[in-house]
Curated annotation (Swiss-Prot):
Species for this entry: Xanthomonas oryzae pv. oryzae (strain KACC10331 / KXO85)
Disulfide links within the chain: none
Pathway: Pyrimidine metabolism; dUMP biosynthesis; dUMP from dCTP (dUTP route): step 1/2
Superkingdom of the source species: Bacteria
Tagged with keyword Hydrolase: yes
Protein name: dCTP deaminase
One Gene Ontology term from the biological process aspect of the record: nucleobase-containing small molecule interconversion
Function: Catalyzes the deamination of dCTP to dUTP.
Family: Belongs to the dCTP deaminase family.
Protein backbone atom coordinates (compact mmCIF):
# COMPACT_ATOMS: atom_id res chain seq x y z
CA UNK A 1 0.00 0.00 0.00
CA UNK A 2 1.52 3.32 -1.02
CA UNK A 3 0.62 6.97 -0.59
CA UNK A 4 -0.52 8.66 -3.80
CA UNK A 5 1.00 11.80 -5.32
CA UNK A 6 -0.49 15.03 -6.59
CA UNK A 7 -0.37 13.63 -10.15
CA UNK A 8 -2.54 10.64 -9.21
CA UNK A 9 -4.95 12.81 -7.20
CA UNK A 10 -5.38 15.21 -10.14
CA UNK A 11 -5.89 12.36 -12.61
CA UNK A 12 -8.49 10.61 -10.42
CA UNK A 13 -10.35 13.86 -9.73
CA UNK A 14 -10.42 14.93 -13.37
CA UNK A 15 -11.09 11.55 -15.00
CA UNK A 16 -13.17 9.80 -12.30
CA UNK A 17 -14.75 12.67 -10.29
CA UNK A 18 -13.04 11.41 -7.11
CA UNK A 19 -13.22 14.94 -5.62
CA UNK A 20 -15.79 17.56 -6.63
CA UNK A 21 -15.39 20.48 -6.69
CA UNK A 22 -11.67 19.98 -7.27
CA UNK A 23 -8.81 22.48 -7.02
CA UNK A 24 -5.67 21.28 -8.86
CA UNK A 25 -3.34 23.73 -7.07
CA UNK A 26 -2.98 25.24 -3.58
CA UNK A 27 -5.20 28.27 -2.96
CA UNK A 28 -3.67 30.58 -0.32
CA UNK A 29 -5.54 33.86 -0.91
CA UNK A 30 -9.21 34.78 -1.25
CA UNK A 31 -10.67 36.82 -4.13
CA UNK A 32 -9.72 40.06 -2.32
CA UNK A 33 -6.09 38.94 -1.98
CA UNK A 34 -6.28 38.23 1.77
CA UNK A 35 -4.40 35.21 3.15
CA UNK A 36 -6.56 32.23 4.02
CA UNK A 37 -5.94 28.76 5.41
CA UNK A 38 -4.85 26.97 2.23
CA UNK A 39 -6.85 24.31 0.41
CA UNK A 40 -6.48 22.21 -2.73
CA UNK A 41 -3.94 19.71 -4.01
CA UNK A 42 -0.66 19.31 -2.13
CA UNK A 43 2.32 17.07 -2.90
CA UNK A 44 0.80 13.93 -1.36
CA UNK A 45 -2.69 14.90 -0.32
CA UNK A 46 -5.69 17.14 -0.73
CA UNK A 47 -6.59 19.93 1.70
CA UNK A 48 -10.38 20.12 2.10
CA UNK A 49 -12.61 23.03 3.08
CA UNK A 50 -15.57 22.99 5.41
CA UNK A 51 -18.91 24.34 4.25
CA UNK A 52 -20.95 27.06 5.98
CA UNK A 53 -23.08 24.36 7.69
CA UNK A 54 -22.15 23.76 11.36
CA UNK A 55 -23.65 21.93 14.32
CA UNK A 56 -22.24 23.28 17.59
CA UNK A 57 -22.48 21.00 20.62
CA UNK A 58 -24.19 22.39 23.68
CA UNK A 59 -25.23 20.79 26.94
CA UNK A 60 -28.40 22.81 27.46
CA UNK A 61 -30.36 19.59 27.99
CA UNK A 62 -27.85 18.17 30.52
CA UNK A 63 -27.90 14.82 28.74
CA UNK A 64 -25.36 12.04 28.51
CA UNK A 65 -23.67 11.68 25.14
CA UNK A 66 -24.69 8.23 23.90
CA UNK A 67 -23.79 7.17 20.33
CA UNK A 68 -26.68 4.65 20.32
CA UNK A 69 -29.28 7.20 21.43
CA UNK A 70 -27.83 10.49 20.32
CA UNK A 71 -30.02 13.53 21.01
CA UNK A 72 -30.00 15.88 17.98
CA UNK A 73 -31.19 18.60 20.38
CA UNK A 74 -27.66 18.65 21.79
CA UNK A 75 -26.59 20.74 18.79
CA UNK A 76 -27.28 24.28 17.69
CA UNK A 77 -27.44 24.61 13.89
CA UNK A 78 -25.45 27.52 12.46
CA UNK A 79 -24.95 28.64 8.88
CA UNK A 80 -22.10 31.14 8.73
CA UNK A 81 -18.68 31.98 7.30
CA UNK A 82 -17.27 31.49 10.81
CA UNK A 83 -18.04 28.97 13.55
CA UNK A 84 -17.21 29.80 17.17
CA UNK A 85 -16.65 26.59 19.14
CA UNK A 86 -17.18 26.98 22.91
CA UNK A 87 -14.27 26.17 25.26
CA UNK A 88 -13.64 22.44 25.73
CA UNK A 89 -16.46 21.58 23.32
CA UNK A 90 -16.82 20.53 19.71
CA UNK A 91 -18.64 21.22 16.48
CA UNK A 92 -19.55 19.19 13.42
CA UNK A 93 -19.27 20.44 9.85
CA UNK A 94 -19.02 18.91 6.40
CA UNK A 95 -16.61 19.28 3.54
CA UNK A 96 -17.39 21.46 0.55
CA UNK A 97 -15.97 18.61 -1.52
CA UNK A 98 -17.90 15.44 -2.38
CA UNK A 99 -15.72 12.30 -2.49
CA UNK A 100 -15.99 9.07 -4.49
CA UNK A 101 -13.33 6.69 -3.20
CA UNK A 102 -11.98 4.02 -5.60
CA UNK A 103 -12.34 0.37 -4.62
CA UNK A 104 -8.58 -0.08 -4.13
CA UNK A 105 -8.06 3.09 -2.07
CA UNK A 106 -8.29 4.09 1.60
CA UNK A 107 -8.22 7.76 2.65
CA UNK A 108 -6.93 9.00 6.00
CA UNK A 109 -7.67 12.51 7.26
CA UNK A 110 -5.24 14.59 9.32
CA UNK A 111 -5.63 18.07 10.76
CA UNK A 112 -3.91 21.15 9.39
CA UNK A 113 -1.08 22.60 11.46
CA UNK A 114 -2.66 26.08 11.43
CA UNK A 115 -5.57 24.78 13.52
CA UNK A 116 -3.61 22.19 15.52
CA UNK A 117 -1.27 24.91 16.79
CA UNK A 118 -4.33 26.74 18.13
CA UNK A 119 -5.58 23.69 20.06
CA UNK A 120 -8.23 22.79 17.48
CA UNK A 121 -8.20 19.10 16.59
CA UNK A 122 -9.91 17.57 13.55
CA UNK A 123 -11.23 14.02 13.82
CA UNK A 124 -12.46 12.02 10.83
CA UNK A 125 -12.57 8.25 10.48
CA UNK A 126 -11.01 6.73 7.33
CA UNK A 127 -12.85 7.03 4.02
CA UNK A 128 -13.22 3.40 3.01
CA UNK A 129 -13.10 1.82 -0.46
CA UNK A 130 -16.14 2.80 -2.56
CA UNK A 131 -17.50 5.17 0.08
CA UNK A 132 -18.93 8.38 -1.33
CA UNK A 133 -20.38 11.57 0.10
CA UNK A 134 -19.54 14.79 1.87
CA UNK A 135 -17.21 14.10 4.79
CA UNK A 136 -18.58 14.96 8.23
CA UNK A 137 -15.81 16.74 10.14
CA UNK A 138 -15.52 16.93 13.92
CA UNK A 139 -13.59 19.87 15.42
CA UNK A 140 -12.58 19.67 19.09
CA UNK A 141 -11.66 22.88 20.88
CA UNK A 142 -9.16 21.72 23.50
CA UNK A 143 -8.62 25.23 24.88
CA UNK A 144 -10.34 27.06 27.76
CA UNK A 145 -11.27 29.85 25.29
CA UNK A 146 -13.70 30.04 22.36
CA UNK A 147 -12.12 28.96 19.05
CA UNK A 148 -12.89 30.02 15.49
CA UNK A 149 -13.20 27.83 12.36
CA UNK A 150 -13.45 29.44 8.92
CA UNK A 151 -15.83 28.13 6.27
CA UNK A 152 -14.58 27.78 2.68
CA UNK A 153 -10.96 27.61 3.83
CA UNK A 154 -8.67 24.63 4.42
CA UNK A 155 -9.39 22.61 7.57
CA UNK A 156 -7.90 19.13 7.05
CA UNK A 157 -5.72 17.10 4.69
CA UNK A 158 -6.79 13.86 3.02
CA UNK A 159 -4.06 11.28 2.30
CA UNK A 160 -4.79 8.61 -0.32
CA UNK A 161 -3.39 5.09 0.04
CA UNK A 162 -3.76 2.64 -2.83
CA UNK A 163 -3.58 -1.07 -2.06
CA UNK A 164 -1.67 -3.57 -4.18
CA UNK A 165 -4.84 -5.67 -4.23
CA UNK A 166 -8.54 -4.80 -4.50
CA UNK A 167 -10.58 -5.48 -1.36
CA UNK A 168 -13.05 -8.37 -1.36
CA UNK A 169 -15.82 -6.32 0.27
CA UNK A 170 -16.08 -2.54 -0.04
CA UNK A 171 -18.02 -0.05 2.07
CA UNK A 172 -20.61 0.12 -0.70
CA UNK A 173 -20.89 -3.71 -0.81
CA UNK A 174 -21.58 -3.74 2.96
CA UNK A 175 -24.32 -1.12 2.59
CA UNK A 176 -22.48 1.27 4.92
CA UNK A 177 -24.80 3.52 6.92
CA UNK A 178 -23.04 6.74 5.88
CA UNK A 179 -22.95 5.96 2.15
CA UNK A 180 -24.00 8.97 0.05
CA UNK A 181 -24.29 11.42 2.96
CA UNK A 182 -24.71 15.00 1.80
CA UNK A 183 -25.06 17.11 4.94
CA UNK A 184 -23.58 17.15 8.43
CA UNK A 185 -24.52 13.64 9.53
CA UNK A 186 -25.12 12.71 13.18
CA UNK A 187 -24.22 9.29 14.66
CA UNK A 188 -26.19 6.30 13.35
CA UNK A 189 -26.34 2.74 14.65
Amino acid sequence: MSIKSDRWIKRMAEQHAMIAPFEPGQIKHDAAGQRIVSFGTSSYGYDVRCSREFKIFTNINSTIVDPKRFDPGSFVDVESDVCIIPPNSFALARTVEYFRIPRDTLVVCLGKSTYARCGIIVNVTPLEPEWEGHVTLEFSNTTPLPARIYANEGVAQMLFFQSDEVCETSYKDRGGKYQGQTGVTLPRT
